[in-house]
């Protein structure tokens, strides 16, 4: 089974895990009256599916079943965006669509045959998560990475950097995925690089100052793990980072606010065992309740 959100999948057409056609929903808002005609071409079918997702002026609900039907027709007629959406729907399931890894794989294979490099990224996820075929996943991710897809560059870099003989290449891919100083980067790639520079794992060059800068960049990009690590550095005044308790606690709350269990647990510990613990008990209890709800949710 594919874990929802396991690799921060950011589908470029706006599709989100566990939801049906939200990318289409966004585009549907721009549709006019043309959707009243019966679609003939694959593109028209896809546009019609978008229109069905847009509630009409009378306030009727979106027609997800109809949208799925027309998206499938467009996909069967080789309209690539529809093919990719069908793969995503079966990859994660939802809105009446039963998750089916093999059906998702067949749609993505079709997309690959049509020339999609992005489809290789998703096939890599299927191979890694479901089939546990690391070699095949690496091959798919390499194709997508070479095409400039940042998520694939990140996953490829992460795997390669776990072994000493491929660590150097792994770091190169992570640097590409991080897009440091540019838009479109993967914050988790900055964090992965920072961990390597901080620990020197697998023969990586140790450079604490560079690691700190990468943690800071990844924190600004919203990665909760980086926010937790950077918060600890600020609280302790370690590795050349000036001690700043206020900023450290603020950073820790940012990580906890993303429902990152480790950050929530650390925040609770500080609130209950630090100065003025009695004054912070109400906040600590609120975070504890939040953590308990998260743990219960993960059990389901």
Annotate each PLM feature.
Residues 31-33:
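Bacterial signal peptide processing site
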Residues 40, 45, 55-57, 77-79, ...:
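Short helix-capping/linker turns of helical repeat alpha-solenoids
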Residues 265-300:
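Terminal, low-structured helical/coil segments at or just beyond the last alpha-helical repeat
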